[in-house]
Amino acid sequence: MEKKRNISMAVIRRLPKYYRYLAELMDNDVDRISSKELSEKIGFTASQIRQDLNNFGDFGQQGYGYNVKDLYNEIRSILGLDENYNIAIIGAGNIGQAIANYTNFDKMGFNLKGIFDVNPKLLGLKIRDVEIRDIDQLESFLQEEKIHIGVICVTKSNAQDVCNTLIKNGVKGIWNFAPIDLNGADNVVIENVHLSESLLTLTYLLNGFN
């Protein structure tokens, strides 16, 4: 399926939730589901779900709903998960180690190829058989390995330099957990993840119930 280029970011950010929920339905041997049933489970309106999916094709049938497996596979393809992606993690602190240890990424086709840090106490240790290397080796590693996604888990002051090194050596996707929005080239996709934003959303909602 050819992806459309004018899809709003709001729609794109809803797709992983559809994908995750459809996977749960498949695990529970559910064969089909209506947009109304999806709405009740996911929290989006049925109309919103239909509009989102119609951006990519006509997947549902009147009176039948959606075939769960077919829709799951379509969204998997839309999300680019028919491909495998090599990733490198820069920063082996708590966040970096948590990401490295998350085995579900393997199941989705994300292959951990390298982990880098500056802390001499961490160098040489292994996380799931991947050795933590000195960050001074990052550039030569990137020149030898085809890395699709760099995961940045370093300090705010070092994040942009790491990002620049990744981009200079051909990495096209940056998943950034440093508390700063990074700048990149036009042909590079950067996803800045600020963990505090989710927490502050929670405190806002909690405050509304007090």
From Swiss-Prot:
It is found in: Cytoplasm. Disulfide bonds: none annotated. GO terms for molecular function: DNA binding; DNA-binding transcription factor activity. GO terms for biological process: negative regulation of DNA-templated transcription; response to redox state. One of its GO terms (cellular component) is cytoplasm. Its main location: cytoplasm. It comes from the Bacteria. SMART domains: CoA_binding. Residues 17-56 bind DNA. The keyword Flavoprotein does not apply. Belongs to the transcriptional regulatory Rex family. Homodimer. Modulates transcription in response to changes in cellular NADH/NAD(+) redox state. This is Redox-sensing transcriptional repressor Rex. The lineage of its organism: Bacteria, Bacillati, Bacillota, Clostridia, Eubacteriales.
